[in-house]
Amino acid sequence: MKVEREFLSRILLPLLFNFFKRSDMKTILPSVAGICILFFILGCNPSLNSQSKYKKLVWSEEFNYKGLPDSTKWSYDKGNGCPDVCGWGNNELQYYTWNRTENARVEDGHLVIEARKEDMQGMKYTSARLATKNKGDWKYGRIEVKAMIPAGRGMWPAIWMLPTNWEYGGWPRSGEIDIMENVGYWPDSVLATVHTEAYNGMINTQKTKGVHQPGISTKFHVYSMEWTENEMFFYVDGKEVNRFANDKTGVAAWPFDKEFHLLLNVAVGGNWGGKFGVDDSVFPQKMLVDWIRLHQ
């Protein structure tokens, strides 16, 4: 926006001034609409960043390296969730590996999380689930993730957040924030969801909204969430998708006054992602992440 504003003030405005001085009204009037549109695009269309009260970059991951994900920023959730929550609580079909470049790596400036059709530890698929827990934990702020997600029936990619210390109890009492979820049988659709004790998927009261977004598996999009003490806002490419307000009734509805951390994963199958089965012909499938930025 800085370059665009300099273009307006130093180049475009003087040219327009001279044009209006030399032109009659018949020439000027048909030009007004086009000029207004140009001004809107260049100068009057604020980004999420310019609207936000959070301006200070406090954490970022640009993936400007090669190999395994940076261990100072990322840990792995491992296996199939057993013995605590086998299938990760959703009857998912993948085995999450760690320190294995076939499933999680950085290359060409992107994080790659790859789901593969292969047997491991009694499961028929492998993938990865990365988390910033105890390496990046935040209360309030704006998080933005530029990503391109996989396609195919049975895929279940997610960009989401969980509480770091579970101070209000186990799921869903301490909350869950889903910045972006997609299931492969709903191509070109993404959802943003909040789970709490009062509002959650187990009792079908979760606060969720979606948007039809063509090209989610062929182009990068920016998935964002802004979190204050009073409200959460969810965006795709700067356009609001969902919001959730603190109704001040207590932690059953709003447990979001504690630190949360970020998770990135590609699940396979499960209660929701596998509702219509898994198409084995689509493997391997990848989620690519270009960058992640957290402002407070």
Where in this protein do the model-derived segments appear?
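Bacterial Sec-dependent N-terminal signal peptides
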Residues: 1-52
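GH16 jelly-roll
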Residues: 46-296
